[in-house]
Regions:
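Conserved two-metal-ion catalytic palm core of "right-hand" nucleic acid polymerases
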Residues: 1-183, 189-191, 203-205, 414-503
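Glycine- and acidic
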Residues: 58, 100-105, 132-134, 165-166, ...
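Short secondary-structure boundary segments
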Residues: 60, 111-139, 208-224, 230, ...
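Conserved phosphate/pyrophosphate-binding and hydrolysis machinery centered on Walker-type P-loop NTPases
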Residues: 66, 141, 215, 219, ...
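Short His-Asn-centered micro-motif
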Residues: 108, 250-251, 308
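Right-hand nucleic-acid polymerase module
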Residues: 117, 231, 258, 287-503
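Conserved polymerase palm-domain catalytic core
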Residues: 133, 148-290, 299-304
């Protein structure tokens, strides 16, 4: 198959993916509108957004590109053959990060993205065996979860280890082109003249430093740039995990961990990427909480390290604290939106059914929480998988992004918080319903004391929708994930669309 035919096929697939994503968004908005229409007197009009860059850059609009696919593919194929191909300028916009600072988002035209992806796959196929086994980013044989699992297993072998944590300032934006190009002919990498030409075409938009974000070829370049650093760390006999520019290094030998500091500095100087001293933790002693004394000061010791969205202890893996805050915020909003807000705004439909064992709004709230935590599964399906009554489960939702979290106390605490949050909201809901004359005192659908409320929601005999009222459990889905990992392996049960960025 010639290049033009390949481009037509791949651009078509990319357009179909983006069009489906937009239609899914459209359907989600419509379903939300229908749900709100059932429970609210006043419903906001449906408002569908399109990305601004679809208008300012037609090459990013999948509907336009799909319609003109043959012309676009022919033009690009001809330009590559004649060596005058250059990607169009990307659309660049900013979104706020959690710390309030802006995060730059780069979106290349669809066809240029496809070119980048084709050459990235070709380069990776030929060269992935050259990359360190401790480099986990942007590869089809490794991923973020493998990194976390390997780190946890190795740290668990010792009651204490020295760890080095460093953060680079804008790794993708600062890396020197001179340093990068020197790597093309070093260290056994196979890069053809055509592939080098395509790389140069994408680098030409970046001046004399930086690699293009938002395009696949930069993923190969990021690993290529770090090859010598990886090699030096391996030669020193250090344990490490690198995901793009995020690197965690550990050892039981203090001298070796100090040597890693010099290696990081040397790489920073050679590649012209400054170290972010404010965000870099430097060298610390990682130890069990019960080990009170050490040769390090209290500031130089820690019981866990945060890496790629997880918090890793010597004997367990947890959610990071900021993730716990995010989880609670999301669930609290679902509860408030469904159970409290309509009553406070006097926007509650009187004929919404509230009878013994039935409260439509409560059912919707619990179903949405369940979908958030573990997708469209119900508790019985998960129990059947754990006990072996069913052989396969499609894991979705929050926990499928964090399959390695095994901090039982943290998960039990989340379960307790969820029950308490529901209980408080239901008590307030019953009070508001009584005050607004929707129901009479003592006639709410479920018991208002916590113990009986939980039993009633989780059993709810006689209600054909009883599965929809069952309270979801972080511990329950954790047990199912453990079974899945043992039975099928980590790569089979994790989300295929696990984010590659923003850890």
């Amino acid at each position: 198959m010639g290049l033009e035919s390949i481009l037509v096929d791949e651009i078509s697939k990319e357009c179909d993916k983006l069009i489906k994503r937009y239609h899914d968004y459209h359907n989600h908005i419509h379903l939300e509108y229908l749900r709100d229409s059932k429970r609210l007197n006043k419903v906001k009009d449906k408002y569908l957004k399109e990305p601004d860059y679809w208008t300012t850059n037609k090459g990013c609009n999948p509907f336009y590109v799909k319609k003109n696919i043959n012309v676009i593919a022919h033009s690009i194929s001809k330009k590559i053959t004649e060596k005058n191909y250059k990607p169009f300028s990307p659309s660049i916009f900013e979104i706020p990060k959690e710390n309030g600072l802006p995060r730059k988002i780069v979106v290349y035209p669809i066809a240029d993205n496809v070119v980048s992806k084709l050459f990235y796959k070709r380069l990776l196929k030929k060269n992935k065996h050259r990359f360190s086994s401790y480099a986990y980013a942007y590869r089809n044989d490794r991923n973020v979860h493998f990194a976390i699992e390997d780190i946890s297993i190795d740290l668990n072998r010792n009651s204490r280890s020295f760890v080095a944590e460093f953060d680079f300032s804008d790794f993708f934006g600062n890396i020197s082109h001179d340093y990068l190009r020197k790597q093309f002919d070093r260290n056994g990498f196979k890069i053809s003249d055509e592939e080098q030409y395509i790389i140069d075409a994408f680098l030409s938009n970046e001046g004399d430093k930086g690699i293009p974000q938002g395009t696949s070829i930069s993923l190969f370049l990021a690993n290529l740039a770090c090859w010598e650093l990886d090699h030096e760390l391996e030669k020193e006999g250090l344990n490490f995990a690198r995901y793009a520019d995020d690197t965690l290094i550990w050892s039981t030998n203090y001298q070796k961990i100090c040597n890693s500091f010099n290696m990081i500095n040397e790489f920073s100087r050679a590649a012209e990427i400054p170290i972010n001293t404010e965000k870099s933790e430097g060298i610390s002693l990682l130890k069990q909480p019960e080990y009170k004394k050490s040769e390090f000061s209290e500031k130089g010791t820690k019981t866990n390290v945060d890496f790629l969205g997880y918090s890793i202890f010597i004997d367990k893996i947890s959610f990071r604290e900021k993730m716990i805050t995010k989880i609670k915020k999301e669930i609290s909003y679902i509860i408030y939106k469904n159970l409290i807000q309509p009553l406070k705004n006097n926007n509650f439909k009187k004929y919404t059914e509230i009878t013994k064992g039935k409260d439509y709004n409560l059912m919707v709230a619990i179903m949405q929480i369940k979908r958030y935590i573990y997708g469209g599964l119900n508790n019985q399906q998960i129990v059947n998988y754990i006990t072996g009554r069913s052989n396969r489960l499609m894991f979705k939702g929050l926990m499928s992004f964090y399959p390695l979290v095994n901090d039982v106390n943290q998960l039990k605490s989340l379960d307790g918080w969820l029950v308490s949050s529901l209980h408080r909201a239901i008590k307030l809901r019953a009070k508001l319903l009584i005050n607004n004359n929707y129901i009479i005192s003592g006639k709410y659908a479920f018991p208002l004391d916590k113990a009986n409320l939980v039993i009633s929601l989780n059993t709810n005999k006689g209600n054909k929708y009883r599965r929809n009222y069952e309270i979801p459990s972080f511990m329950l889905i954790h047990k199912a994930l453990e079974v899945g990992i043992k039975k099928e392996g980590l790569s089979k049960i994790m989300r295929l669309d696990t984010p590659e960025y923003d850890y």
